[in-house]
Amino acid sequence: MQKDRAAYDEMYELIRPVVKAKTVLELATGTGLIAKHIVNAAAHIEATDASAEMIAEAKRDNRSAKLHFSVQDMFCLPYADKSFDVVIVSNALHIVPQPEKALAEIHRVLKDEGALIAPTFTHAGNSFFGKAKAFFMKLAGFPLHSRWTGEE
C-alpha cells in the first residue's frame, strides 16, 4: 500500500504544474482523490463519475469552492466544445468498452492547446505478474480492451 501511495503522491506532484490556474475536467473521478489533491493548483475542477454512489462519497469531505462533483456519462458530456484546458482520466480508459468513443468526447471538450492526462496503473505488459493481474482483472469483469503506445 505504501508503494501505491508513493506512486499517487508522485502523480499529484506531476499533475499540479500542468493544471496550474487552468480549468480541469476529471472523468471517472471515483471518490475524488486526484481532484482533491490538485484543486489548490487549478482555477476550477469539474470532477465526474458515472456512479452516483462514488460522487456522493466524493462530495462528503469537499471543502473547496473550486471543485464541483457531478454524475456524468463520459460518452455524452454536457459541456460545450473546447471548454477545458486539461482533461484527466485516470485508471479508466483501459476498462471502458469503447475507449475511442470516450477519447472523441474528450477531444470535443478539450481546448485546442489543451492537455489530456491519462495515467493508468495496470500491469507490466508481458511479465508473469502482469499477465496474472490482467487475467484476474478479466475474471472480475474488467478486461483490458486496448493498449496504446507512444506513437499512437
Where are these regions (language model features)?
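Conserved alpha-helix/loop element of class I SAM-dependent methyltransferases that forms part
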Residues: K3-K22
